Each structure stands twice: as structure tokens, then as C-alpha cells.
UniProtKB/Swiss-Prot annotation:
Active-site residues, as the UniProt record annotates them: 61
Protein name per its UniProtKB record: Orotidine 5'-phosphate decarboxylase
Binding site for substrate: 8, 30, 59-68, 118, 178, 187, 207-208
GO MF annotations in UniProt: orotidine-5'-phosphate decarboxylase activity
TM region(s), chain numbering: none
Annotated family: Belongs to the OMP decarboxylase family. Type 1 subfamily.
E.C. no: 4.1.1.23
This protein's pathway: Pyrimidine metabolism; UMP biosynthesis via de novo pathway; UMP from orotate: step 2/2
Amino acid sequence: MQLCVALDLEKKEDNLSLLQELKGLDLWAKVGLRSFIRDGATFLDEIRKIDGNFKIFLDLKLYDIPYTMANAALECAKLDIDMLTVHLSSAKSALTILMQRLNALKKRPLIMGVSALTSFSEEEFLMVYNAPLKTQAITLSAIGKESGIDGVVCSVFESLAIKEALGKGFLTLTPGIRLDKNDKEDQERVANAKEAKQNLSDFIVVGRPIYQAKEPREVVLELLKDC
């Protein structure tokens, strides 16, 4: 299991300062919408300057009509990133075209499809998708696998079921990881790193428990032990 550190701080300088503290550790730097829109593609180069071994996860959750989404993914791939997210509900046609385009490249990032955001409660998900959360997460994940993507973004609580349905080689990335599961904030389906590993998660995403800590590096070292 691998650790992705979410760079969601208010200022670019704060994100870079955090990475300076984590230099030399085996982790992924997750750049989301806020940081990418604010700081641009050059932010990725600044991450690499701190530690060239940091792997870069561009978490943009692309969702659009097929060719628009595929073209956007191609532009992202040109930034030499290691992982990119797209929405599974964009449908099989969009995902298939996207993967055809990316597979033509000499090197492409891992493509992870978002199934159900971890901010969804069971009730909210049912209202939007008119289906039970775990059932629909597996259905969407199957569409993703048929389209050729590498894996899915899901909560810890769907990870094992997705692995059992689609095989252990189909990757799962699980956000909503907390040190204290009572500390949900804007997440609903949270778990700790040990539970993520028990449910066969390949990647975990941790943000606030790291950057709100007095000693972020110590928190990351503890998390890496659980990985």
C-alpha cells in the first residue's frame, strides 16, 4: 500500500514547506483542483525540485464529453505526471476513447476512476444514483475495468468488494483516511490506514491529519509503517 499526501493548504508556499519536511520519504504528492488552478503546472516542477523521487498524482477528476475529456487527459499526461483521476460516470465510451489516446503515448500516467466520493452518505448517494452505494460502486468500477483504466477511487468500505468482483490487480485508491475516525469533517465514509490495508487498498490519501499535525513528518512515518 502506498501513501498519497494531499496538498490542500491555503498557500503554495505552505504546500512546498510541507514537502520540504517530507523530503526523502517514499510517497505521492497529490495535487488537487484548488492547488492546480491557483498554482498552475509549474507547481509540479517545484515539487520535483524538492525531491525528484516524489510521484505526482494530479487529482482533477475529469468529467466531460468523450473527446473533450480525452484531450484534457492528453494535456495532463504531457506534464509527466504519474497518476490522474477521471469520473467513471462519464461512461464507457468516454473512458475507452481516453485510454486509447493515452495508450498511444510512450509513457502514460495511471488512470483512476472516481466511483463514489467519500463525502457521500448512503442516503445522499441513493438520491443521486437511485442505487445502493456499494452495488453502484462495483458497477461503475466494472465499466472502468472494461474501458482499460488501471483502477478506481473508492472508500475503504468498497475496496474489498471491488477487488473480489474485479480481481486484485485492479487498483483501489482510498481517500477519507483519518488517524481518529471521529474526525470526519466534510467526509462521511472514513477509516484508518490499518483498515485500508485489511481491505486491500493499493493507495491511501491523507491530508489534514498530516498538515494539521505539529510534527507532520512523524505522522507520515507512522502512516508508512501501516502501509
